[in-house]
């Protein structure tokens, strides 16, 4: 063995001209990220202990912090086509390099193809021998979705690197809705809870009043956080179920299935019942399904085409009615107003 029989001389050299040792305290993204933990912790639940990875293994705190870092270090003229990394200064990389996350942040699935299903198994054994969730990787998936959402808002409302410039550009709108979502979500939320809180925040936002709901659904669903996605048990990071489905109402808006006005429902708004109306004869019974605004099936009935559809049990709100039968395949919005 060389080490036991010979003397080994080792020379360590430090050349300031070629070796860079950077302090993360000078990395704007890292500084914003760490302050971001205070924002997400203070605004969720009781404001102190509601983002615990030991209670909910889908703890997304690292994701909100990355999102805040990305948003507050946006450059003038930036586009969705420029991928972003986190911690690139501290690692002596370019701002377009990967940084310290599994992939660069980008809505391009060829660059960042991570989705909700990938959170399954994101755990590791720590130095104490305990199996714990990999909160940075889990948060990275959440931030990926939020970053996608930012660029969709930008497509619709425009971009601003200065989120304090005005309240109407897409960058400011999405940041405000994400911030408001923190205040609406329950203690120790899952991805599902976080998604629903952002949807609720958008519905309550007087600038849009729910007009961007389907845009939000499409973004989350594209990464596997669709209508039928399930978080499973909060204490298990291996039982999440992904879904690419969007609410029936959003499918309706996309496909415009009633373009020819071949089908309608009346009265609309309705109180305790409504009727189907078609410009052609309908044979046999029709299956009528009613979905609420979140895409949840709240009523399923089979009725003759001329019979009333009962809505007594439905509270006021906007619904989607889907009617199927022999030669029938229609969808329509319905408002219940009692």
Where do the language-model regions lie?
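Extracellular protease catalytic domains of secreted zymogens
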Residues: 1-247
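A generic alpha-helix propensity feature with a strong bias for hydrophobic helices
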Residues: 105, 110, 250, 270-272, ...
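Intrinsically disordered, low-complexity boundary segments flanking structured domains
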Residues: 164-165, 252-253, 296
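Low-complexity, Pro/Thr/Ser/Gly/Ala-rich linker/spacer regions in secreted
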Residues: 245-261
């Amino acid at each position: 063995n060389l080490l036991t029989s010979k003397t080994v001389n080792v020379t360590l050299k430090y050349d300031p001209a070629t070796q860079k040792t950077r302090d993360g305290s000078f990395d704007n993204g890292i500084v914003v990220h760490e302050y971001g933990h205070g924002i997400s912790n203070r605004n969720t639940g009781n404001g102190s202990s509601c983002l615990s990875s030991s209670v909910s293994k889908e703890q997304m705190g690292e994701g909100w912090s990355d999102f805040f870092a990305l948003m507050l270090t946006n450059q003038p003229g930036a586009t969705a086509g420029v991928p972003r990394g986190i911690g690139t200064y501290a690692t002596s990389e370019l701002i377009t390099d990967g940084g310290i996350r599994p992939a660069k942040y980008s809505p391009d699935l060829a660059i960042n193809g991570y989705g909700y299903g990938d959170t399954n198994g994101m755990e590791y054994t720590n130095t104490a021998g305990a199996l714990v969730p990999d909160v940075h990787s889990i948060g990275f998936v959440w931030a990926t979705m939020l970053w996608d959402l930012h660029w969709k808002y930008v497509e619709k409302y425009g971009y601003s690197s200065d989120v304090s410039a005005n309240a109407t550009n897409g960058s400011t709108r999405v940041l405000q809705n994400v911030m408001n979502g923190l205040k609406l979500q329950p203690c120790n939320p899952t991805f599902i809870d976080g998604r629903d809180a952002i949807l609720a925040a958008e519905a309550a936002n007087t600038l849009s009043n729910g007009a961007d709901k389907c845009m939000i659904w499409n973004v989350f669903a594209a990464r596997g956080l669709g209508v039928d996605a399930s978080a499973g048990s909060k204490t298990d990071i291996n039982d999440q179920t992904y879904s690419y489905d969007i609410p029936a109402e959003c499918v309706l808006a996309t496909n415009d299935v009633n373009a020819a006005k071949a089908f309608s429902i009346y009265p609309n708004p309705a109180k305790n019942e409504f009727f189907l109306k078609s410009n052609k004869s309908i044979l046999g019974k029709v299956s009528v399904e009613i979905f609420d605004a979140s895409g949840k099936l709240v009523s399923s009935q089979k009725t003759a085409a001329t019979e009333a559809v009962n809505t007594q049990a439905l509270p006021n709100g906007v619904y989607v009615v889907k009617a199927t039968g022999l030669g029938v395949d229609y969808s329509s919005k319905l408002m219940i107003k009692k």
